[in-house]
């Protein structure tokens, strides 16, 4: 197989062929941008730190890819048995595919295997640049470096890849120069191929270790590491595999046994084993891991390769800068872990508060921010200041910027929460104080409440902001936020004042409605009292019907003037401006006219006004000038009295049809009384106001139309209906007068005496009849003298009515107990429903027209 054609190689547009792996770097040193897609495809990206990377080194055509395919069940390209030439070009990566039936044979999760181009190939010749760069890349990313050599190469320099290992050691000193406790270690795993067993594996190990020690001693070590040993940086493992072709079964068995070693391991801190020696269990020790999260590995690897490839002065970056970059980044990550432990919970709480929409002020945030920032920067400076000065300063600035970015976000969020919370609490506190003042029934100073609560809110905001500040941070200033907070408080104060003004206007309007309702009721109830009667006042002059509109207008104006005085006095305590008061008074006058208009329309409803006219007529027809009820006699001028009373009542209809003052015979000056809209009024101030004819030009109604209470059609209909009602009263009076003239003829008494003489003599001669007749006569005389005939007649009528009702009830119960009876009752009910509704409406006229005049007790305390 010539190349890894079934892998996703560098240059693939979609990079979708991920079944077997991906080419990380091609032969021309180009990095594959699809590496992250492959890791996502293999579900490695969400693994965090739960992954492991293995690289394999060795001479070209020594079976490296074959070893990986057999050991990890990968599908790297291998050399054809019929020809010997390069198969692996660049660096390839694949995920371990080996599975196991039990936990003892199972490998670690997410093992990534990197197949590196072989060394000492004829294709590159003496060009060792790629060899050195690939070694640097593998060492910077891998935990375990597998060195694939043949048994007969042990003891050789080039054949045993000692030149490559020297490069690895040099690169390691450049990358991982650290103190002992934090030095990342790597594992060099020597796999000796075609192991026959004649030479014990331990002897081969000793030979290789001696060669490695000599190479290490020959290196030019950085200051401070002159006396270091190779075991300070590397651990070593050795394994031998039989010949694949000559001993295939044993080869497969040893490979299976070898696969069980690639699992997570743990080094016992109390162990006395020498450094550099293998440990029992898995080969993946925590100190081998490069601590790069899986989701950032692709970016990390690309950045490492970019640094390696673009170094034009040396094959590898200079010691100091590369080491400084690595160490500073590592130290920054370490100190940020502690920083996250302190600040992270606050960030989570603040984010949760933002998502919930509830402003959350974090307690002790300022203390935690100051402590975390100071401790983080101090720890970084202590650990990283000994490295390259320029890199250190750059990394310090980056770390400080990163920390300050997060702290600034927390600081801004805290101020934002304090801002929102302060505004909400200010609004609630003012509203609560106002409600408390209303409940007590006493007057309260709204302006004083607002001033007091605003001062408390600003003090609380400044306290929260000052305790959250971080000294020395350029962003730790809250003057602008304080100014915005004060502006918002002013807006809220203005809005609360407007709301309170609206509530005041509503209370005043309700007060006006209550006062006008009672007064207008009295005026309309007094219709007809000019001639006395049931509606006449007990004392004082009787009002004239012609001046009813004058009295109503006077009552209306005086009531509204009193309401304006109350409104103005209360508005002063709100610290309202003159413009706001003018707008409020203008709205009050318009609203009050609407209340009066509505009340008059209620009184002028067809049922109500007809009832009033009938009462007026009956007062004039049934009562004399001094209010004494008339008892009709045949000699009375019933027609004349009826005509006079009817015409007098009919004259009220045109009077009530239009709102006109008797003094001027013209409508009241409503337009002048309401006045023009103040210049400070907004569209919102007039959107809930009903248009008024003669005042609002856009309404299209004149003042005359606004003052029309009854249309011509309603007047005519009302006249007709009233005349019918008056005719009924007249007929009733006429009938009662005619019924009183019936007399018994005189001859009837002579006839009665002649025909009843025998019965009279029989009664007079019989003592029992005579005594009974005498008792009846005495009883009748006494009843007459005591004026008891009326009560006795009433009692008799009541008893008869009760007897009739009882009979009806018994009859109804009887009918309801039979089907035919229920059907008859249903038909009778439908026929009588119209009559009953008319009677009910007639009986409830005066009650149905009443409006709810009950107001809050606070209305009188405006």
From Swiss-Prot:
Q: Where does the UniProt annotation locate this protein?
A: Endoplasmic reticulum membrane
Q: Does the record's keyword annotation contain Metal-binding? A: no
Q: Which residues form the GB1/RHD3-type G domain?
A: 48-301
Entry GO MF terms: GTP binding; GTPase activity
Q: A Pfam family for this UniProt protein?
A: Sey1_3HB
Quick one: a GO biological-process term for this protein? endoplasmic reticulum membrane fusion
The region called Disordered is annotated at 818-862
Q: How does it sit in the membrane?
A: Multi-pass membrane protein
Q: Give its E.C. classification number.
A: 3.6.5.-
Name any GO cellular component annotation. Answer: endoplasmic reticulum membrane
Entry binding sites for GTP: 58-65
Listed PROSITE patterns: G_GB1_RHD3
- Could you list which ranges are Lumenal topological domains? 765-767
Keyword list (alphabetical) reads: Coiled coil, Endoplasmic reticulum, GTP-binding, Hydrolase, Membrane, Nucleotide-binding, Transmembrane, Transmembrane helix
Q: Function, please?
A: Cooperates with the reticulon proteins and tubule-shaping DP1 family proteins to generate and maintain the structure of the tubular endoplasmic reticulum network. Has GTPase activity, which is required for its function in ER organization.
**Protein name (Swiss-Prot/TrEMBL):** Protein SEY1
């Amino acid at each position: 197989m010539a190349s890894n054609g079934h892998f996703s190689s560098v240059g693939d547009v979609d990079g979708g062929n991920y079944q077997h792996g991906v080419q990380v770097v091609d032969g021309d040193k180009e990095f594959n941008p699809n590496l992250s897609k492959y890791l996502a495809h293999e579900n490695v990206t969400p693994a965090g730190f739960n992954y492991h990377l293995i690289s394999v080194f060795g001479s070209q055509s020594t079976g490296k890819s074959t070893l990986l395919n057999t050991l990890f069940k990968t599908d790297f390209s291998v050399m054809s048995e019929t020809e010997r030439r390069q198969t692996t070009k660049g660096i390839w990566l694949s995920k371990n595919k080996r599975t196991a039936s039990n936990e003892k044979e199972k490998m670690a999760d997410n093992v990534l295997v990197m197949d590196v181009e072989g060394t000492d190939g004829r294709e590159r010749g003496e060009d060792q640049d790629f060899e050195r760069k690939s070694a640097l890349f593998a060492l910077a990313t891998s935990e375990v470096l597998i060195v694939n050599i043949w048994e007969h190469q042990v003891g050789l320099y080039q054949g045993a890849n000692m030149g490559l290992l020297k490069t690895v050691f040099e690169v390691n000193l450049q990358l991982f120069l650290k103190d002992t406790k934090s030095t990342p270690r790597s594992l060099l795993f020597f796999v000796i191929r075609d192991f026959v067993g004649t030479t014990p594996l331990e002897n081969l190990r000793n030979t290789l270790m001696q060669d490695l020690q000599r190479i290490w001693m020959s290196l030019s070590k950085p200051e401070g590491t002159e006396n270091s040993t190779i075991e300070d940086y590397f651990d070593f493992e050795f394994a031998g595999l039989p010949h694949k072709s000559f001993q295939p079964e044993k080869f497969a068995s040893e490979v299976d046994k070898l696969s069980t070693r690639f699992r997570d391991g743990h080094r016992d801190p109390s162990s006395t084993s020498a450094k550099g020696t293998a440990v029992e269990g898995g080969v993946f020790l925590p100190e081998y891991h490069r601590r790069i999260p899986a989701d950032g590995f692709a970016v990390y690897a690309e950045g490492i390769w970019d640094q390696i490839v673009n170094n034009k002065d040396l094959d590898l970056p200079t010691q100091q800068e590369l080491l400084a970059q690595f160490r500073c980044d590592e130290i920054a990550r370490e100190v940020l872990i502690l920083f996250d432990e302190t600040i992270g919970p606050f960030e989570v709480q603040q984010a949760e508060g933002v998502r919930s929409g509830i402003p959350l002020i974090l307690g002790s945030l300022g203390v935690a921010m100051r402590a975390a920032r100071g401790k983080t920067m101090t720890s970084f400076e202590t650990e990283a200041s000994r490295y390259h000065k320029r890199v250190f300063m750059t990394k310090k600035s980056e770390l400080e910027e990163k920390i300050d970015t997060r702290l600034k976000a927390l600081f801004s969020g805290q101020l934002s929460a304090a801002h929102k919370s302060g505004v909400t609490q200010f609004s609630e506190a003012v509203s609560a104080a106002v409600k408390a003042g209303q409940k007590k029934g006493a007057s309260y100073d709204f302006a004083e409440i607002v001033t007091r609560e605003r001062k408390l809110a600003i003090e609380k905001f400044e306290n929260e902001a000052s305790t959250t500040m971080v000294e020395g941070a350029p962003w730790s200033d809250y003057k602008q936020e304080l100014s915005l907070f004060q502006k918002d408080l002013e807006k809220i104060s203005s809005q609360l004042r407007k709301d309170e003004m609206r509530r005041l206007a509503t209370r005043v309007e309700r007060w006006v409605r209550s006062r006008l309702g009672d007064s207008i009721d009295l005026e309309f109830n007094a219709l007809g009292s000019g001639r006395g009667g049931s509606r006449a006042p007990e004392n004082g002059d009787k009002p004239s019907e012609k001046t009813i509109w004058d009295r109503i207008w006077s009552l209306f104006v005086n009531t509204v003037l009193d309401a304006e005085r109350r409104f103005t006095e209360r508005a002063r305590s709100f610290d309202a401006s003159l413009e706001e008061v003018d707008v409020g008074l203008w709205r009050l006058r318009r609203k009050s006219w609407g209340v009066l208009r509505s009340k008059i329309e209620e009184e002028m409803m067809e049922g109500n006004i007809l009832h009033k006219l009938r009462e007026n007529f009956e007062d004039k027809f049934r009562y004399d000038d001094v209010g004494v009820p008339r008892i009709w006699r045949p000699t009375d001028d019933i027609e004349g009295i009826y005509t006079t009373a009817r015409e007098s009542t009919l004259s009220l209809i045109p009077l009530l049809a239009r709102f006109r003052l008797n003094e001027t015979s013209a409508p009241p000056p409503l337009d002048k009384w309401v006045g023009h809209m103040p210049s400070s009024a907004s569209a919102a101030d007039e959107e809930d106001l009903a248009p008024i004819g003669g005042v609002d030009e856009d309404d299209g109604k004149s003042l005359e139309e606004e003052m029309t209470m009854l249309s011509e059609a309603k007047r005519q209909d009302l006249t007709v209906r009233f005349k019918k009602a008056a005719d009924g009263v007249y007929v009733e009076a006429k009938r009662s007068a005619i019924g009183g003239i019936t007399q018994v003829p005189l001859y009837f008494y002579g006839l009665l005496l002649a025909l009843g003489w025998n019965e009279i003599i029989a009664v007079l001669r019989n003592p029992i009849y005579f005594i009974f007749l005498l008792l009846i006569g005495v009883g009748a005389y006494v009843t007459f003298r005591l004026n008891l005939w009326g009560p006795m007649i009433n009692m008799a009528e009541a008893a008869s009515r009760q007897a009739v009702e009882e009979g009806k009830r018994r009859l109804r119960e009887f009918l309801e107990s039979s089907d035919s009876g229920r059907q008859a009752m249903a038909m009778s009910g439908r026929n009588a429903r119209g009559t009953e509704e008319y009677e009910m409406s007639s009986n409830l006229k005066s009650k149905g027209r009443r409006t709810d005049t009950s107001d809050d007790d606070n209305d009188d305390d405006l």
